């Protein structure tokens, strides 16, 4: 352009890219669909896992999809019903999202069915595990099986008619049902009935374990429960002729909405909300393609749903039930048993307090055992010098040694304060039971702050010692759940750091009382300051990049959704900061876009264990700062939950976490890399071969062997 005063040429200003451009973002829901596709790929890959582990991934894919419909699709359905056409950050309206979800899911279900019927079933048969049908059995076997049906199944069934005298039967969420058309043998009248396949019984029947059937050749024969019910319908409908029978399965809206400000008793309100899940609107109706239009339309009309919510599945409905096959005792068809390392096994005494006083401890689960965490709480419960235990509980499991330790401590007259998050989705009933049990034991139980879920993972133990009161802390990235601790990757940080202890004390006071503490010296807390802190840390790396050229950010988490922080990462990339993101699930950021995100790499590791840890690494001018915690980068985590991030200071632990991150990022066997268009490509090949989870297991086993040698030498 020309300078108007002197006529000289000056360069035109380079336009700043519009970082709100929808093309720069991946749709949240479709990104989740992509994640579940990566789970499905584990089942499809015959070289990746033993046979029954592939079955497990089919089950996980299916149960994931069910939950997605119960929550996310249900929400989109609500928006469509309310006439909401607001576009998401990527430019899609709710109805457009539903259309794309349906298209993607139908393709995935076809893949899943082809995998199960054309690949896995024949492979199972070759290994001596075979699904059979009732009709394939001999007449004598069918008669014996009929006796089994009368004794074990018939008493649980409830046939329900539908006509002018019988209202359309209620059908609960996730229920598998049989739609039956009947003819009255006396009047010739055509009737309709429904039979629910009882969820209280095993969905898969082991015929080889039923006495008298003659299956004693060592092979395992399996039968679907619905097949047995269908072949014995004449016992449920005497003097009726069975014209046709078709299975169907429904999924309902399961999202609970509680107006906490109006709820007089939160626990009671949550209980009512859990019960209401049974009555949520139908968001998916699974049928087989051969269901006639007459029955299909009858179901759609009376379930008050839409044709767009009907999915012709084909084959077996409700494949999450395949998890039952993992009960089969065939170690040759499963992953080799892995027993984690317990770093305290080499100690003469099991005094965890003494270990923590000697230095901070970092456990990397499941490669390191969760047992030291459980032992810490039990030791505190039994120790007469321990005065109080405070803990947050989100998902703890149905038979929790952690909660039992807290109950024991309360019974010993220790001050026990527990925040039980009643709103932990699909764990509400379990948490309600534990909350009542803790109260009965004498613990102080609170349910958190109104309008906020408490997702932070914190334990604080106060102990009287010669020098005065000392605080022992456990801070984690995962739940206090001994079952998931064996299959989720997480970190546990055990410390007596006094500054961190002061912060945790203040946070517990905020959670259990009316404290309005606003400043923390070490802890990062949402919704108070976490969003601001992450933005500041990203800006600091931009400054380091400008001055020293060594700006680097590594983040590991389950999901990256927040638009404001994605824009900040884009700006950091534009400034030259190298950014590595290990995001297992949803990622709305697009890497590798020239001029915008070319310095960002996104990978997703899907393997034997579920990647669950949250790690935030900032190079900080080669003086690395590492924070661990409970928060993903999603609006809900930053604005609507109580989350914590905590610093790891001790150099040896910082180096350990850095090493873990580099190993995860170098994975070229179980890792997927996101492309600039938002799609993923499996990282395969490359030398040396790096399967990060397998290498973490090997490292754990080496440490275990070293501990055994050390113990022998004591």
Swiss-Prot record:
Q: Which CDD domains match?
A: PLDc_PaPPK1_C1_like, PLDc_PaPPK1_C2_like
Q: Molecular function terms in GO for this entry?
A: ATP binding; metal ion binding; polyphosphate kinase activity
Residues binding ATP: 64, 488, 584, 612
Question: Which reaction(s) does its UniProt entry say it catalyses?
Answer: [phosphate](n) + ATP = [phosphate](n+1) + ADP
InterPro entries given for it? PP_kinase, PP_kinase_C_1, PP_kinase_middle, PP_kinase_middle_dom_sf, PPK_C_dom2, PPK_N_dom, PPK_N_dom_sf
Q: Name one GO cellular component term.
A: polyphosphate kinase complex
What's the short name of a Pfam family annotated to this entry?
PP_kinase_N
EC numbers? 2.7.4.1
**NCBIfam families in the cross-refs:** poly_P_kin, PRK05443.1-1, PRK05443.1-2, PRK05443.2-2
Q: What is this protein called?
A: Polyphosphate kinase 2
Which species expresses this protein natively?
Chlorobaculum tepidum (strain ATCC 49652 / DSM 12025 / NBRC 103806 / TLS)
Primary gene name: ppk2
């Amino acid at each position: 352009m020309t300078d108007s005063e002197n006529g000289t040429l000056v360069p035109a200003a380079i336009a700043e890219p519009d970082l709100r451009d929808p093309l720069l973002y991946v749709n949240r829901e479709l990104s989740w669909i992509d994640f579940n596709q990566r789970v499905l790929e584990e089942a499809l890959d015959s070289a990746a896992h033993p046979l029954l582990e592939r079955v497990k991934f089919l089950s996980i894919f299916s149960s994931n999809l069910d939950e997605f419909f119960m929550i996310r699709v249900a929400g989109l359905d609500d928006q469509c019903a309310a006439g909401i056409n607001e576009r998401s950050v990527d430019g899609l309206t709710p109805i457009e999202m539903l259309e794309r979800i349906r298209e993607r899911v139908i393709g995935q279900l076809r893949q899943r069915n082809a995998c199960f019927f054309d690949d896995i079933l024949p492979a199972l048969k070759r290994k001596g595990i075979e699904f059979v049908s009732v009709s394939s059995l001999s007449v004598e076997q069918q008669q014996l099986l009929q006796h089994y049906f009368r004794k074990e199944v018939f008493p649980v069934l409830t046939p329900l008619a539908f006509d002018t005298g019988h209202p359309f039967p209620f059908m609960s969420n996730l229920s598998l049902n049989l739609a039956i058309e009947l003819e009255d043998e006396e009047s010739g009248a055509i009737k309709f009935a429904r039979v629910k396949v009882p969820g209280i019984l095993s969905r898969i029947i082991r015929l080889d374990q039923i006495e008298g059937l003659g299956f004693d050749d060592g092979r395992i024969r399996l039968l679907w429960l619905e097949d047995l019910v269908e072949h014995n319908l004449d016992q449920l409908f005497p003097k009726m002729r069975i014209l046709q029978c078709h299975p169907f399965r429904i999924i309902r809206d399961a999202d609970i909405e509680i107006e906490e400000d109006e709820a007089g008793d939160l626990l009671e309100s949550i209980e009512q909300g859990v019960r209401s899940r049974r009555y949520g609107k139908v968001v998916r109706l699974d049928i087989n393609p051969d269901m006639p239009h007459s029955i299909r339309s009858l179901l759609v009309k009376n379930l008050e749903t839409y044709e767009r919510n009907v999915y012709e599945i084909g084959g077996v409905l409700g494949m999450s039930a395949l998890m039952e096959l993992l009960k089969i005792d065939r170690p040759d068809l499963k992953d080799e048993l892995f027993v984690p390392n317990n770093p305290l096994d080499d100690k003469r005494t099991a005094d965890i307090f003494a270990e923590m006083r000697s230095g901070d401890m970092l456990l990397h689960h499941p490669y390191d055992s969760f047992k030291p965490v459980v032992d810490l709480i039990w030791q505190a419960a039994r120790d007469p010098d321990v005065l109080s235990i405070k803990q947050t509980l989100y998902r703890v499991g149905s038979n929790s040694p952690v909660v039992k330790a807290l109950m024991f401590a309360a019974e010993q007259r220790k001050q026990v304060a527990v925040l039980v998050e009643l709103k932990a989705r699909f764990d509400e009933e379990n948490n309600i039971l534990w909350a009542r049990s803790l109260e009965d034991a004498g613990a102080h139980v609170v349910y958190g702050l109104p309008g906020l879920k408490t997702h932070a993972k914190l334990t604080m133990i106060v102990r009287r010692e010669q020098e005065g009161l000392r605080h022992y802390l456990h801070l984690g990235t995962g739940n206090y759940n001994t079952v998931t601790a064996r299959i989720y990757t997480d970190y546990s940080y055990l410390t007596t750091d006094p500054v961190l202890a002061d912060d945790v004390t203040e946070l517990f006071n905020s959670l259990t009382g009316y404290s309005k503490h606003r400043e923390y010296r070490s802890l990062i807390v949402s919704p108070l300051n976490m969003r601001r802190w992450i933005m500041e840390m990203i800006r600091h790396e931009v400054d380091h990049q400008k001055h020293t050229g060594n700006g680097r950010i590594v983040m590991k988490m389950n999901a990256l959704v927040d638009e404001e922080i994605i824009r900040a990462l884009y700006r950091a990339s534009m400034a030259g900061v190298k950014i590595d993101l290990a995001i297992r699930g949803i990622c709305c950021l697009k890497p590798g876009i020239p001029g915008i995100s070319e310095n960002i790499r996104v990978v997703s590791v899907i393997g034997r264990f579920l990647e669950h840890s949250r790690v935030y690494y900032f190079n900080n001018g080669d003086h690395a700062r590492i924070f661990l915690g409970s928060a993903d980068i999603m609006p809900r985590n930053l604005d609507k939950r109580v989350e914590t991030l905590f610093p790891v200071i001790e150099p040896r632990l910082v180096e350990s976490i850095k090493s873990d991150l580099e190993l995860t990022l170098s994975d070229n066997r179980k890792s997927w890399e996101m492309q600039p268009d938002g799609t993923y490509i499996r990282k395969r090949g490359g030398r040396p071969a790096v399967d990060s989870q397998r290498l973490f297991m090997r490292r754990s086993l080496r440490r275990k062997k070293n501990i055994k040698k050390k113990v022998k030498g004591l």
